Amino acid sequence: MNDEDQDDKTKELPLGKETEANLFKSRSIFIYGPINQELAQKVCSQLVALAAASDEDIRIYVNSPGGHVESGDSIHDMIKFIKPKVWMIGTGWVASAGALIYVATPKERRLCLPNTRFLLHQPSGGTRGMASDIEIQAREIIKMNERLNRIMAAATGQPLDKIDKDTDRDYWLSAEEAKDYGLVSRIVTSQADI
């Protein structure tokens, strides 16, 4: 490795730390990418740290294809658990377990950018093994689906039977459709709108 390569690597590290410090100061968290245990641990730690630092509002930007439901549950529950108010800003796509996290705040604090797309659907699982184990997993997925649909119905104001029907297959919504559906309170185009 030559000196120029070393200088480039050295320059990258402080920028990352500086960005993290600025995000902490601005009380902003980014949930970008798949929802998994590692992301849940990071986001929950950030939420607890921000709550310990101050009661000021927190902003969470969500752009996720979804992922592990239980990891989404832990973020969803932690958002409700901490004292500061949390604002959700959807961007890109807010799908599946990402939508579960997104609805952790009251509707009036759920915003999105104009080109955000939302995806609601039933959870899926891949299991194999003995028939009795597959049956157990199927029952658990059905219970999870019922629980998630109750959460989504409460968050949107839609009747549970409509949520059941809509999430039976992939249900895509534009930002405007998500607003009409009750997922989003406002579509924003700048930080000044928040």
UniProtKB/Swiss-Prot annotation:
PROSITE patterns: CLP_PROTEASE_HIS. It is found in: Cytoplasm. Gene3D superfamilies: 2-enoyl-CoA Hydratase, Chain A, domain 1. Keywords: Cytoplasm, Hydrolase, Protease, Serine protease. One of its GO terms (biological process) is protein quality control for misfolded or incompletely synthesized proteins. Coiled coil: none annotated. It is an enzyme of class 3 (hydrolase). It catalyses: Hydrolysis of proteins to small peptides in the presence of ATP and magnesium. alpha-casein is the usual test substrate. In the absence of ATP, only oligopeptides shorter than five residues are hydrolyzed (such as succinyl-Leu-Tyr-|-NHMec, and Leu-Tyr-Leu-|-Tyr-Trp, in which cleavage of the -Tyr-|-Leu- and -Tyr-|-Trp bonds also occurs). HAMAP family: ClpP. Fourteen ClpP subunits assemble into 2 heptameric rings which stack back to back to give a disk-like structure with a central cavity, resembling the structure of eukaryotic proteasomes. Belongs to the peptidase S14 family. This is ATP-dependent Clp protease proteolytic subunit 3. The gene is clpP3.
